[in-house]
């Protein structure tokens, strides 16, 4: 009989930020979790490093094949387009809601926090996310987070509030990844 490792769904679409996926994925794998790439469609998605396309990533499961009860958490990397594209798909936002309602960890970095806000799982929680209003005001997450009932934390490398783990930038990947693992172990 094979031991089954707990699974994390990495919700990813085109133009996701590679550093925000691969660093936490490695940390989660090392901590004993399998990470499955889940997207709206089961087609390869474009990998970006900031605004430069660097390749393609295979998708393990389309959202319609993913069952919330099979996952102990969700990883939502940022990127210029990925979180917004996913937030337009009601199957994805419902999946995030269902995993959260089951007590699963919702971990978002940078603009990934947009998907959590638009999935309505941040009310009455402290959180952070992409906040560089000077350089890219159109990508800032704070208005969506506050509209969804969250309390915005501006200058913190990681914010943990119950099952929600958020970080504003990939430069905090080590602290973010450690916080995800700690939150998962505390479940």
What residue spans do the PLM features occupy?
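Beta-strand segments within the central parallel beta-sheet cores of soluble alpha/beta enzyme folds
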Residues: 126-128
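Terminal hydrophobic/aromatic helix or amphipathic segment near a protein terminus
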Residues: 130-132
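Catalytic nucleophile serine of serine hydrolases
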Residues: 110
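Extended, subdomain-level signal for the structured scaffold at the beginning of enzyme domains
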Residues: 1-106, 114-124, 134-187
């Amino acid at each position: 009989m094979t031991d089954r490792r707990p699974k994390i769904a990495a919700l990813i679409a085109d133009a996701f930020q590679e550093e925000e996926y691969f660093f936490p994925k490695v940390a989660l794998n090392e901590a004993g979790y399998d990470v499955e790439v889940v997207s709206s469609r089961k087609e390869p998605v474009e990998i970006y490093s900031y605004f430069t396309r660097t390749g393609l990533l295979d998708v393990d499961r389309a959202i319609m094949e993913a069952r919330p009860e099979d996952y102990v958490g969700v990883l939502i990397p940022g990127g210029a387009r990925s979180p917004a594209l996913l937030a337009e798909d009601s199957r994805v936002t419902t999946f995030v809601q269902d995993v959260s309602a089951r007590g699963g960890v919702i971990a978002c970095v940078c603009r990934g926090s947009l998907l959590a806000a638009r999935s309505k799982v941040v009310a009455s929680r402290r959180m952070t996310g992409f906040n560089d209003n000077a350089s890219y005001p159109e990508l800032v997450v704070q208005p969506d987070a506050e509209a969804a009932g969250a309390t915005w934390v501006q200058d913190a490398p990681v914010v943990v509030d119950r099952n929600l783990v958020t970080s504003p930038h990939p430069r905090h990947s080590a602290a973010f990844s450690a916080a995800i693992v700690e939150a998962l172990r505390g479940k």
